[in-house]
Curated annotation (Swiss-Prot):
It comes from the Bacteria. Pathway: Glycan biosynthesis; glycogen biosynthesis. The lineage of its organism: Bacteria, Bacillati, Cyanobacteriota, Cyanophyceae, Synechococcales. Catalyzes the formation of the alpha-1,6-glucosidic linkages in glycogen by scission of a 1,4-alpha-linked oligosaccharide from growing alpha-1,4-glucan chains and the subsequent attachment of the oligosaccharide to the alpha-1,6 position. Its EC number is 2.4.1.18. Coiled coil: none annotated. This is 1,4-alpha-glucan branching enzyme GlgB.
Length: 756
């Protein structure tokens, strides 16, 4: 054994470490070969004594260069598993040396793929990863911050002091450090010092778990523990074409569906109560449900309603409840409001076991300015554009991703793969696609920048969306990718290889606006607006449309669905029944927002929950039963969904009876030859001898009637069905003379086995 000596460069490096300005601690710390011997240097701020424990020997370490750099000289390589005994503030503990692990974590191919934007599993390298290295347990941290002067890991185990664990700069703007002793559940952040000397504390962009708001630290979490039970579901999903399946979606917000009392805590498996997460200050005494509680309550409820999918408004971690989840700071973490990532995995697993798909809202269009988030991440506009004319949504107070940067696109595309792979979700709905596609979205003249061709189209965002959808379907062919796109941008649901955006469904915003405008009218005036309810068919096959009555239509003074309707209470419910039945029989997949299924009477409030007490009353119970039966009927009739996106699947009988506000049409299914006749009367006046033409003679069974008394109607109808007459109308030689109840939709099926 030899003695350490004073070196000027070590003194200088020690000063840089103390000032948190060092980007290459491995050049100084850990085992260093020097003139035929090995010098072990330990960086231990504020320690009074350090001893090296190696090969069964204890060696006192000295501080010849800096009071916080402890050194010992050895005659042989100590390896990497040695420990140090540290005395600090009178407390002694033993630990392994972070700087003993010099080798790079991010490989050359990883760096290459990330730099070109094509590392679809980059989260397997970025973030905080629990691992064992040569028998030493700890956490590997990896961060992208190319313009930072220095980066350090802050955490519970180092007193949130950035001087303790400076990270090593690697190629490509990456920073790495393996810290022995950090465990699952450890809170941490990154301390980023900019070239200008400013210091920011940032949550991990790739963090797999974060603290419950208002706290903002990341949490070390394990990705490989949960044992999935949905192999059959996943195999079947990826083997079928989602577009020729029935899709009926219950859109909902986990935090405002139903609350529990704070004095009734969730009990963990070990019998201890979990600390409640308050719903909001506006509702004292209420707490949010946990993922396990939601699995017990929400899943049976949605299954009983007959929906095929649950759509969750954004559940990526977000600090502000009032953003509804659309201002994300934790892209790789389900929100901790409701529990752990594994508990969310179990929620999805349970959905699949009960036959329900899971769709999540995904928000790649913008992000908030919160100090712990992505904004100005390394002292530069790293994730966002520097020019606010292209990098900021002023009306929303959010920033726009710089889609021209490969690493930023990689962050988002890999995030998409992450949610499908790690959480087995079945689909995404991309929010506010129009805000991504147009550079002048919500911007006055002079406050936006034209593209390279002088146009308003955001070509960078277009290429990003195409890449994201291409990668998604490459990995998960049975997935759903739904665009909320409110303009007439062409080919939204066309494949990327022919110039489309690559989604497989698009919300039909035009249909939604036309329907609500029509149904809000006094029924007498509807005769002058028949085009509102028929126009959607003329463009129904230009995209793969999903019909949606979403959360956006029951907030901000727009009232609830029930109170949008004219007339007395009975007429309001009848109008809603007719609207929903027309929606379910119209071409396109279906989505409605929570509360609409039973007639919520107030606007949606993110800080409250639904008015479940209304189900004590018959009209609300009747509407809920209507939705139950609509879903059951819909799923059992291939004519209503098999050919949603083929013109063969729909045929008008008559769309021109403006005077009576009546429409009639057929839904058809090509492979099985089945078809249905749908007749809708959108006035409060019933008709006892209303005639429509039909293509075949025989008996037509009335298989659905929204005026049934079990739904709250008056039970008018056609006594179970009608025979045809040889009366030529609507271009058909055969016709039916029907009773049409007020504000109703009727569905008939031809029964060839029943004689005239």
């Amino acid at each position: 054994m030899t003695t350490s000596v004073a070196l000027d460069w070590v003194v200088q490096d020690g000063q840089r470490l103390a000032e948190c300005r060092h980007d290459d601690p491995f050049s100084l710390l850990g085992p260093q070969s020097h003139e035929g011997q090995w010098i072990v240097r330990i960086w231990m701020p504020e320690a009074s004594q350090v001893e090296l424990l190696c090969d069964g020997r204890t060696t006192a370490m000295t501080t010849p260069n800096h009071s916080w750099i402890f050194e010992a000289a050895l005659n042989q390589n100590p390896g990497r598993t040695y420990q140090v005994r540290v005395k600090r503030a009178g407390i002694v503990h033993e630990q392994h040396d972070p700087w003993a692990f010099h080798d790079e974590w991010m490989g050359e191919m990883d760096r290459h793929l990330f730099a070109e934007g094509n590392h679809h599993h980059i989260w397997q390298r970025m973030g905080a990863h629990l691992m064992e290295r040569e028998g030493v347990e700890g956490v590997m941290f990896c961060l992208w911050a190319p313009h930072a002067c220095s980066v350090a890991v802050l955490g519970e185990l180092n007193g949130w002091d950035g001087r303790h664990h400076p990270m090593q700069r690697r190629q490509g703007g990456l920073w790495e450090l393996f810290i022995p002793g950090f465990k699952e559940g450890t809170l941490y952040k990154y301390e980023i010092r900019t070239q200008e000397g400013h210091c920011y504390q940032k949550a991990d962009p790739y963090g797999f778990q974060h603290e419950v708001r208002p706290a903002t630290s990341s949490v070390v979490a394990r990705l490989d523990r949960y044992q999935w039970q949905d192999e059959q579901w996943m195999r079947q999903r990826d083997s079928r074409n989602a577009l020729d399946q029935p899709i009926s979606v219950y859109e909902m917000h986990l935090g405002s569906w139903i609350h529990a009392a704070t004095d009734e805590p969730y009990i963990e498996l070990d019998g201890t109560p979990r600390a409640p997460v308050p719903a909001a200050d506006m509702k004292p005494g209420a707490r949010l449900l946990t993922y396990p509680e939601l699995a017990d309550q929400l899943i049976p409820y949605v299954k009983d309603r007959g929906f095929t999918h649950i759509e969750l408004m954004p559940i990526s971690e977000h600090p502000f409840d009032g953003s509804w989840g659309y201002q994300v700071t934790g892209w790789y973490a389900p929100t901790s409001r409701f529990g752990s990532p594994d508990e969310f995995r179990a929620f999805v697993d349970r959905c699949h076991a009960e036959g329900l798909g899971v769709i999540i809202d995904w928000v790649p269009g913008h992000f908030p300015k919160d100090g712990h988030g992505l904004a100005f991440f390394d002292g530069t506009h790293l994730y966002e554009h520097s020019d606010p004319r292209i990098g900021e949504h002023k009306e929303w107070g959010t920033l726009i991703f710089n889609y021209s940067r490969n690493e930023v696109r990689n962050f988002l595309v890999a995030n998409l793969v992450y949610w499908f792979e790690q959480f087995h979700i079945d689909g995404i709905r991309v929010d506010a696609v129009a805000s991504m596609l147009y550079r002048d979205y919500l911007r006055p003249d002079g406050e936006w920048i034209a593209n390279e061709d002088g146009g308003r189209e955001n070509t960078e965002a277009v290429r990003f969306l195409q890449q994201a959808n291409h990668v998604l379907f490459q990995h998960f062919p049975g997935a759903l990718s739904i665009a909320e796109e409110s303009t007439t941008w062409p080919m939204v649901t066309q494949p990327t290889d022919i110039g489309g955006l690559g989604f497989n469904l698009k919300w039909n915003m035009g249909w939604m606006h036309d329907m609500l405008d029509y149904f809000e009218l006094d029924p007498w005036f509807r005769q002058f607006h028949q085009n509102n309810i028929t126009f959607s068919i003329w463009y129904a096959y230009t995209e793969n449309f999903m019909l949606a009555l979403s959360h956006d239509e029951v907030v901000h003074g727009k009232s609830n669905l029930l109170h949008k309707m004219p007339g007395d209470d009975w007429q309001k419910f009848a109008n809603v029944r007719a609207l929903l039945a027309y929606m379910w029989t119209h071409p396109g997949k279906k989505t409605i927002f929570m509360g609409m299924e039973f007639g919520q009477r107030s606007e949606w409030n993110v800080w409250g929950d639904l008015q479940w007490e209304l189900l004590k009353h018959d009209p609300h119970k009747g509407l809920q039963r209507l939705v139950d039966d609509l879903n059951t009927f819909y799923k059992g009739e291939p004519a209503l969904w098999k050919d949603d996106f083929d013109q063969y699947g729909f045929q008008w009988i008559d769309c021109n009876d403006n005077r009576h506000s009546v429409i009639s049409f057929m839904r058809r299914e090509s492979s099985g030859g089945t078809w249905l006749v749908v007749v809708a009367n959108f006035t409060p006046q019933s008709h006892s001898n209303y005639r429509i033409g039909v293509p075949m003679s025989g008996y037509y069974q009335e298989v659905f009637n929204t005026d049934s008394s079990c739904y709250g109607g008056r039970n008018l109808g056609n006594m179970g069905g009608k025979n045809t007459d040889e009366f030529n109308i609507h271009g058909y030689e055969q016709s039916l003379e029907l009773c049409l109840p007020a504000l109703s939709v009727l569905v008939f099926r031809h029964d060839p086995k029943r004689s005239l």
